[in-house]
């Protein structure tokens, strides 16, 4: 099993270099050649992983030489995919590079898992774990066909993901509000601790008043991301280095929105600390202001269509001011 152990070590080394490596400098980038070559190497990886898995499903197991050949075939296919990734220049977009890198990393991680299952298995038959691991490699390999092919498409996918997280946070807070006076009503009473009469599990009237502008900020976050995505779809371009860089800037700034929304949402649950809520609301407000400013200065927002920026900017100010007014006593 020495070739299998060596394969696992080599794959971990490839994974480490993949995440730390820089793009290779070379000739003019050829997009069609890049995607075709990547597709071939990913397909080869899937085939070689299947061969390796099948070879260790039942006796007789491969000889040392046979195992080495199988391992070499799989390692070479993965090295080919990593090499193709290195040919993708930064000028094509940081977001696109990260998307491709993570897709290849998923393939390598799935393959490492498969190899480790083979190493740990003492039963010479197709185990459930081996079956699942092989399927995971296939699934990761199949994802390459769905990858965005330029930075514009990659940015749309990423920012849409941020929007989904924000939507979930808003739904959870609204659900908690509609569940009644006690947001923890599903928690049973404890005879030793006592009834759920503890005020720490309830929103006070002051809490509920403060929730309104905070939820307003969260909804402004949702509207902001939706508008940014719409602007990217309508006006986004990946035709020049400047446009590509501006799209990457939008990803960088919008990625701060969902964590800020989550922080605010968590601080809104009882027992509510109004000073903490105010601080988190201010953080979110600052992030949204930055998103709007960077969007306004980019090519995705023509001057003639910037009214939504002004509207959302005012909405953020309005809700933040209400939050401040309701938390004066907490300072």
From Swiss-Prot:
<feature type="region of interest" description="Disordered">
    <location>
        <begin position="175"/>
        <end position="197"/>
    </location>
</feature>
<keyword id="KW-0131">Cell cycle</keyword>
<keyword id="KW-0963">Cytoplasm</keyword>
<keyword id="KW-0539">Nucleus</keyword>
<dbReference type="GO" id="GO:0005634">
    <property type="term" value="C:nucleus"/>
</dbReference>
<dbReference type="InterPro" id="IPR049317">
    <property type="entry name" value="GCIP-like_N"/>
</dbReference>
<dbReference type="InterPro" id="IPR049318">
    <property type="entry name" value="GCIP_C"/>
</dbReference>
<feature type="compositionally biased region" description="Acidic residues">
    <location>
        <begin position="175"/>
        <end position="192"/>
    </location>
</feature>
<dbReference type="InterPro" id="IPR026907">
    <property type="entry name" value="GCIP-like"/>
</dbReference>
<dbReference type="Pfam" id="PF20936">
    <property type="entry name" value="GCIP_C"/>
</dbReference>
<protein>
    <recommendedName>
        <fullName>Cyclin-D1-binding protein 1 homolog</fullName>
    </recommendedName>
</protein>
<comment type="function">
    <text>May negatively regulate cell cycle progression.</text>
</comment>
<dbReference type="Pfam" id="PF13324">
    <property type="entry name" value="GCIP_N"/>
</dbReference>
<comment type="similarity">
    <text>Belongs to the CCNDBP1 family.</text>
</comment>
<dbReference type="GO" id="GO:0005737">
    <property type="term" value="C:cytoplasm"/>
</dbReference>
């Amino acid at each position: 099993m020495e070739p299998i152990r060596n394969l696992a070590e080599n794959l971990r080394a490839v994974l480490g270099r993949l995440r730390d490596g820089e793009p290779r400098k070379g000739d003019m980038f050829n997009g069609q050649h890049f995607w075709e070559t990547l597709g071939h190497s990913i397909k080869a990886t899937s085939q070689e992983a299947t061969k390796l898995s099948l070879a260790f499903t039942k006796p007789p197991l491969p000889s040392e030489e046979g195992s080495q050949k199988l391992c070499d075939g799989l390692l070479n296919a993965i090295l080919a995919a990593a090499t193709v990734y290195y040919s993708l220049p930064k000028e094509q977009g940081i977001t696109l590079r990260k998307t491709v890198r993570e897709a290849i990393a998923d393939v390598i991680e799935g393959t490492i898992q498969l190899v480790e299952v083979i190493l740990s298995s003492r039963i010479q038959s197709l185990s459930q774990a081996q079956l699942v691991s092989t399927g995971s490699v296939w699934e990761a390999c199949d994802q390459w066909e769905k990858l965005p092919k330029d930075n514009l498409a990659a940015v749309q996918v990423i920012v849409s993901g941020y929007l989904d997280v924000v939507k979930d946070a808003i739904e959870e807070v609204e659900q908690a509000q509609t569940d009644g006076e006690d947001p923890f009503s599903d928690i049973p009473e404890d005879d030793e601790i006592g009834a759920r009469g503890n005020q720490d599990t309830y929103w006070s009237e002051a809490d509920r008043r403060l929730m309104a502008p905070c939820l307003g900020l969260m909804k402004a976050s949702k509207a902001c991301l939706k508008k940014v995505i719409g602007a990217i779809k309508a006006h986004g371009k990946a035709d020049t280095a400047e446009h590509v860089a501006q799209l990457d800037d939008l990803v960088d700034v919008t990625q701060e929105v969902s964590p800020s929304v989550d922080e605010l949402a968590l601080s809104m649950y009882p027992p509510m600390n109004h000073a903490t809520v105010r601080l988190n609301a201010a953080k979110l407000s600052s992030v949204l202001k930055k998103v709007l400013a960077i969007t306004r200065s980019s090519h995705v927002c023509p001057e003639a269509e910037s009214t939504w920026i002004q509207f959302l900017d005012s909405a953020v100010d309005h809700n933040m001011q209400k939050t401040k007014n309701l938390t004066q006593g907490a300072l």
